[in-house]
Design a protein with these regions (language model features):
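Beta-propeller fold recognition
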Residues: 1-320
Length: 320
């Protein structure tokens, strides 16, 4: 994500010397602890050393986690160019990781959190944790999407979980989620928690079987989540469009032939309530995962154009 970062940090009012940088996840460290568990910022204006490191902000990992943390997904960047009503320069960044955490970074000129507490550039805080471990397989490999809720007027982040390297895994205990999480402090930056004290799934409404909106999160709730059945996993980042978040989902095959392709679904969910609106897509619905069946194979990120949904599939399609 490319943007201009304040050269003098908190409180900087002079923007002429702001620096163009690229912010990205630290990558995939696989088995090496501490490699890739960060937000990496690249200086795009260093002519003497092109592509030089501007800053690496380490993400605090969970000591109790059995997952080697990394950040393979792209960050969500909020700047005055991408959102209305913002008075700061620079940006706020949200980044998910394999441990199932969402970390918020302050890369703006904000100097106060609105409550009288000092804010510094490069500050970070853990917004949410989904409680991932190797048993439940709730890795966050993919990026998130974000929108301002039409009803709540708050920033919502959408994410999904699943072991993308072992997409056909049907080991007992695997249980993945579709998630809608709100940041009630946006557009400010506030120190919330370290990973061990961050809000978790218990602060969210379980809207798994809700098709009426009866389980819509209240103001005090952190958001909503949907439990995927039959070892299903998300296969790309969600896409939010006109009040609905669309998730590409893969359900492993139930065939005795483990080389058979599993089923690809699009789960359409109300962005603020977590209500399952997949039936509105006009496709046949899955038996247990009540999402719109697309075909057999793995779906890409869903793209919207002209009120239509588009996606690639690595298999057989059955969609009009």
């Amino acid at each position: 994500r490319i943007f201009r970062i304040p050269n003098h940090g908190a409180g900087a009012a002079y923007i002429e010397d702001d620096i163009y940088v690229a912010a990205m996840g630290g990558g995939y460290g696989t088995q090496f602890e501490g490699v890739g568990s960060n937000l990496t910022i690249i200086n795009l204006e260093d002519s003497s050393n092109p592509g030089s490191l501007y800053k690496v902000i380490e993400i605090e990992d969970l000591a109790s986690s059995d997952i080697v943390n990394s950040t393979p997904g792209s960050p969500v960047l909020i700047t005055p160019d991408t959102a209305t009503g913002i008075t700061f320069t620079g940006g706020l960044i949200y980044l998910s990781d394999l441990e199932g955490k969402i970390t918020k970074f302050n890369l703006s000129n904000l100097s106060d959190d609105g409550l009288g507490n000092r804010v510094k550039i490069f500050d970070s805080t853990t917004l949410f944790t989904v409680g991932s471990n190797k048993t439940n397989g709730r890795y966050m490999y993919h990026s998130m999407d974000a929108t301002i809720g039409g009803t709540t007027n708050e920033l919502w982040l959408f994410a999904g979980t699943g072991d993308f390297e072992r997409i056909n895994d049907t080991t007992r205990g695997v249980e993945n989620y579709l998630l809608g999480i709100k940041d009630k402090d946006y557009p400010l930056y506030r120190e919330i928690a370290n990973p061990t004290k961050a809000d978790d799934i218990t602060k969210c409404k379980n809207t798994t079987n809700d098709t009426t909106g009866s389980k819509c999160p209240q103001n005090a709730d952190k958001g909503w989540y949907i439990v995927l059945k039959d070892y299903a996993k998300i296969t790309a980042e969600p896409t939010v469009y006109k009040g609905t978040a669309y998730f590409p989902v893969y359900e492993p095959t139930k065939s005795v032939n483990k080389c058979s392709l599993g089923n690809a679904y699009i789960c359409g969910v109300d962005d603020e309530c977590g209500t399952n609106n997949s039936s509105q897509l006009g496709q046949s619905m899955g038996k247990n995962n009540k999402c719109a069946w697309v075909g057999q194979g793995v779906l890409s990120k869903i793209v919207t154009f002209g009120d239509k949904l588009f996606a690639n599939i690595s298999g057989k399609v059955d969609c009009s």
